[in-house]
Amino acid sequence: MAKVNLEQIEHAVRLILEAIGDDPNREGVLDTPKRVAKMYAEVFSGMHEDPKEHLHKVFGEDHEELVLVKDIPFYSMCEHHLVPFYGVAHVAYIPQGGKVTGLSKLARTVDTIARRPQLQERITSTVANSIMEVLEPHGVMVVVEAEHMCMTMRGVKKPGAKTVTTAVRGVLENDAAARSEILSFIKTK
């Protein structure tokens, strides 16, 4: 996949400034196109990474009980409005066959998936599917909580409203007690 085209973004931002009635040569916004291009390269850096790559680092550990990394902060950009949404992801899995990954690898996977024009639902399911595919655990549960600026700044204008999405895979799909246990761990501060 091609890298971010900074010049093209700069040109587009100048056009947006003109389209809203601003002067792109005005002192306060003169460097805005360059700043926005640089920001987009960072914010959308996940476009050029395979999130599964982070999960391939495994440790041969005979642990087949729950592993939960909770409150992983993330930010993303709504693909519908190109405004931010941000929150936390909680990633739980039950390892199988000695395939335990580093805890930071779960956080890196979330970041890589989130750093692209995205939907919260897709982040949630892609994290779960990536873990299932690479680590082949007994089960996975991903819970994502986020506030969407497209609901805060425009439209319905409801600051503070949180959206919660879940993805459950493997043995956890049919184990309500295990899902409840994971949710209770997530709620515990």
Curated annotation (Swiss-Prot):
Q: What catalytic reaction does the record list?
A: GTP + H2O = 7,8-dihydroneopterin 3'-triphosphate + formate + H(+)
For this protein, what is the EC number? 3.5.4.16
Pfam families to which the protein is assigned, alphabetical? GTP_cyclohydroI
The cross-references to PROSITE patterns, in alphabetical order and at most eight, read: GTP_CYCLOHYDROL_1_1, GTP_CYCLOHYDROL_1_2
The terms describing its cellular component in GO are: cytoplasm
Respond yes or no to whether keyword Hydrolase is given for this record: yes
Q: What enzyme category does the UniProt record give?
A: hydrolase
What family does the Swiss-Prot or TrEMBL record give for this protein? Belongs to the GTP cyclohydrolase I family.
**Subunit:** Toroid-shaped homodecamer, composed of two pentamers of five dimers.
Official protein name in the record:
GTP cyclohydrolase 1
